[in-house]
UniProtKB/Swiss-Prot annotation:
<dbReference type="GO" id="GO:0004867">
    <property type="term" value="F:serine-type endopeptidase inhibitor activity"/>
</dbReference>
<comment type="function">
    <text>Plays a role in mediating viral host range. May act to inhibit a caspase independent form of apoptosis to allow efficient virus replication in infected cells.</text>
</comment>
<dbReference type="GO" id="GO:0005615">
    <property type="term" value="C:extracellular space"/>
</dbReference>
<comment type="similarity">
    <text>Belongs to the serpin family. Poxviruses subfamily.</text>
</comment>
<dbReference type="InterPro" id="IPR036186">
    <property type="entry name" value="Serpin_sf"/>
</dbReference>
<dbReference type="GO" id="GO:0030430">
    <property type="term" value="C:host cell cytoplasm"/>
</dbReference>
<protein>
    <recommendedName>
        <fullName>Serine proteinase inhibitor 1</fullName>
    </recommendedName>
</protein>
<keyword id="KW-1035">Host cytoplasm</keyword>
<dbReference type="InterPro" id="IPR023795">
    <property type="entry name" value="Serpin_CS"/>
</dbReference>
<dbReference type="InterPro" id="IPR042185">
    <property type="entry name" value="Serpin_sf_2"/>
</dbReference>
<dbReference type="InterPro" id="IPR042178">
    <property type="entry name" value="Serpin_sf_1"/>
</dbReference>
<dbReference type="InterPro" id="IPR023796">
    <property type="entry name" value="Serpin_dom"/>
</dbReference>
<dbReference type="Pfam" id="PF00079">
    <property type="entry name" value="Serpin"/>
</dbReference>
<dbReference type="InterPro" id="IPR000215">
    <property type="entry name" value="Serpin_fam"/>
</dbReference>
Amino acid sequence: MDIFKELILKHTDENVLISPVSILSTLSILNHGAAGSTAEQLSKYIENMNENTPDDKKDDNNDMDVDIPYCATLATANKIYGSDSIEFHASFLQKIKDDFQTVNFNNANQTKELINEWVKTMTNGKINSLLTSPLSINTRMIVISAVHFKAMWKYPFSKHLTYTDKFYISKNIVTSVDMMVGTENDLQYVHINELFGGFSIIDIPYEGNSSMVIILPDDIEGIYNIEKNITDEKFKKWCGMLSTKSIDLYMPKFKVEMTEPYNLVPILENLGLTNIFGYYADFSKMCNETITVEKFLHTTFIDVNEEYTEVSAVTGVFMTNFSMVYRMKVYINHPFIYMIKDNTGHTLFIGKYCYPQ
């Protein structure tokens, strides 16, 4: 939640989407090669990110690999591209096993194309490229984690009921969206009143063991107060208050595709991961050469329609030399926060939807 909160502060009126699973997986790979204070910071941060995962679902190596049986439509993959000019330690290579490949970073264009092709393949063609800028001549290693999720709704929306409706970007700005309609579905729902405002939470299940949770403020511009006040603990408490209601749900079809990846370096530094960047970085368990994290890139894609939700995310790290009851009607027609989660306790994706793209 903390990375998401930092991002939405920087992107106030923009659509935001991240995959905590992808980010954590990348940090875990870095931790395999970290030593000293760098390892201490990474281990502590990974432990904090992993706090809300049930003990029996945690990985002994702190890798956030989501169990396929628990979320059958989720695919995760990691890849480490290391310079063929560096001799990496055998102990590090043993930990990352088949996910490592040597490349020639001096042949920058060929290596860039190779990496982007892997990203495209792992995300089922939904993210065509992670690397949009030329590679630095100082690049020594790139760590990438890709997540692709596609799930059918348990209660599909009827296509013939989809219609054009208003979506309020703010009180003064209105646009139109394709509004999907789901009728007479038994969904988990709660309305919460907090000091900072009222809002509804609705849990919309997919086939299998995953769902999309939407937090919809009562006020058209109420999302800003939720952004400021939401925490993992509060969200867990609110979800514990959900109960089954018969609901007619009106929800926009939406698609979010990023034009440029986020560079998470400043955010991770703000959150205490200062010793993986710059002079104090210690990745001596990877190799004898002094290397540090130069960029921490993260990009995502989501497509929500009547039949399914499809989401992809990629995180990349560049190392260089120095997410019978009466029927209610719920209209999702203004900015909201959404999460996709599985029943293992993992938040696969978390986002904010402000306007149609």
